[in-house]
Amino acid sequence: MKDRGNKNTSKTRQTVKSRRTRKTTKQFVERKKNLSAKTTIRNNRLQNNLSPQTTPTEKPVDYATARVFPQHTPYDIKFNKEKYRNNEIYAYSKLRKISNAVFRQEKEINRLTVFTDKPLADLSFKMPVNTSTTEKKEIVRSTECQRQDRNTVNAFKIFQSYETSPPYSPCSPKNFMSEIYRLFRCYNASIVQIQVYSRNKILINAMQEKLMSIGNMVINVGEQIISESVHHEPVVAIAINQFFRGTVPQTDALRKNAVTPIPVNASKKKLVGICSLMINAPTEKDLLCAAHVCINFAICYPNEITLNIAKLTQPMLLQEHITIYNSFNKYIYWDDYGKLLN
């Protein structure tokens, strides 16, 4: 009986061992198969990346990839500007505004590249002058520099009239007011100056009388005078460029060529015919009212007025306006805003 019991126990032990070995061998074989499959996939990927003759599989391009990679987008997915500009359905849509803005920006860039690619002979411009309401208009040239090339471009042709200019062009009233708002966010009115240029003296005098009806105005009116017009030599142009950029060591000869003025005959000065009007004010309220007056004149006479705005290096404040300046800025910088609201 004892021998039979020992035999049975030995058999059971062998069966358990065999079952364990079968399980471990199965797991080992499965792991080996998985590793071999992974290695084959990795080798195939490496071969596909290294081989130059492999062609990528063409997949349909969705709108997300078209937005990120526009060079891989088909023609029907791309932004169709003509569709949004001409279709009546998009008359009041933002897509119409976006397409118009993109088209206008491309047009301005093309116009500027055409303008800058050609050399400039002078900075003179022709403009009809209204000496009175009954006399005829005359053409006045600003300088005596003659054109050397027929393909040269007039520098002031880039500035269009207020009626035909786009809303974001350099001479538009919208751009002029946006620059005033931008400067007023950083500086006060004592550092900002409005400049008006025109050949029509009657128009400048009318604008001066209109501005004098606004309080706290400081106006400087005069006609521009130019000295004798001469051309610079290439050595002078290179010297002044090197002087400012610091590409070469600043020697005495370089400073002399850069700083020494070109002597001309002072008796050859002459009046250009352009009247300039400089406007300053101690407060933002006064200067903003003056800007609206200038814009109204520019809209009524678009071809005869040029507006400009400048930021001064130091405040221009008269003694009569110091108390006005202090009382106006007291509520902004010193006291609490709650006092104004109450």
UniProtKB/Swiss-Prot annotation:
Feature: compositional bias, Basic residues: 14-25
Stretch list, region Disordered: 1-33
InterPro entries: Herpes_IE2_3
Gene Ontology biological process terms from the UniProt entry: regulation of DNA-templated transcription
Family to which this protein belongs: Belongs to the herpesviridae U84 family.
Protein name in UniProt: Protein U84
Gene that encodes it: U84
